[in-house]
C-alpha cells in the first residue's frame, strides 16, 4: 500500500510539472490602462446625466491613453548579401655582396647562418615570400508575418501621434508563442474600423518568438553551436 501511494505521488508530481503555465507579461509591452476619472454625481430626477451620454457622431477610433487599436500585421522582408575576398602578396628582397677596395667582402666563419649557406661565405643573399587568401560567402533571408494583434495606446505625443504597445501570448501543446509590438501611429493612418497596418508604424518593434518543446527541437546543441561559432579556427 505504501509503495502504491509513493508511485501515485511521483506520478502526480510529474503530471503537475508538465502542465502548461502562462508566463508573466513583459513590462515593456504591458497594456496601458486609461486614467480613471470618476463620473459626476447624477442629479436625481433629471432625464440627462452628464458623463453617461452616447454620442451618435463620436469617432470611435483610438485617440487617448488606454484606447485599444488593432494592428494588421503585414510584414515581409527579403534580403540577400554576398561577398568575395581575395588577397595576394608576393615579396622579394635581395642583397648583393658589398665590395671593399675593388674586391668582394668574404668571411671565413663556417656554420654561421645565413653565411654558411652562401657561396664563398659572402654577404650576398635573397629572400622571397608569397602568400594568398581567398574567401567568399552568400546569405539570403526571407521573412513573412501576417495576422492581427490588438494593443493599447500608451502615450499621446504633443503632435497628436499615438504611442502604442502590447503583446499576445498563445499557449499550444506545452509551448508558448509570443507576439510583441510597439511603435508610433499617426492618427490619419487609422482606418474607420479602428485598424492600422503595421507598415504605417514608426519606430516599430515587432517580435515573434516561442518556447517549449518545439522551440527547443529547432535549437542546435552546445557542441554544434561551438563548431559554428567564431571560436572555431577552421
Swiss-Prot record:
Signal in keyword set: yes
Keyword Signal: yes
GO BP annotations, alphabetical order: bacterial-type flagellum-dependent cell motility
Keywords associated with the record: Bacterial flagellum, Cell outer membrane, Lipoprotein, Membrane, Palmitate, Signal
Lipid anchor positions (S-diacylglycerol cysteine): 18
Any Pfam family hit: FlgH
Topology with respect to the bilayer: Lipid-anchor
Cellular component terms per the entry's GO annotation: bacterial-type flagellum basal body, distal rod, L ring; cell outer membrane
Coiled-coil residue spans: none
Locations listed in the record: Cell outer membrane; Bacterial flagellum basal body
Highest taxon, organism lineage: Bacteria
Region forming the signal peptide: 1-17
GO molecular function, one term: cytoskeletal motor activity
Self-association and partners: The basal body constitutes a major portion of the flagellar organelle and consists of four rings (L,P,S, and M) mounted on a central rod.
PANTHER family: FLAGELLAR L-RING PROTEIN
Entry's family note: Belongs to the FlgH family.
Name of this protein: Flagellar L-ring protein
Source species of the chain: Nitrosococcus oceani (strain ATCC 19707 / BCRC 17464 / JCM 30415 / NCIMB 11848 / C-107)
Lineage of producing organism: Bacteria, Pseudomonadati, Pseudomonadota, Gammaproteobacteria, Chromatiales
Gene from which the chain derives: flgH
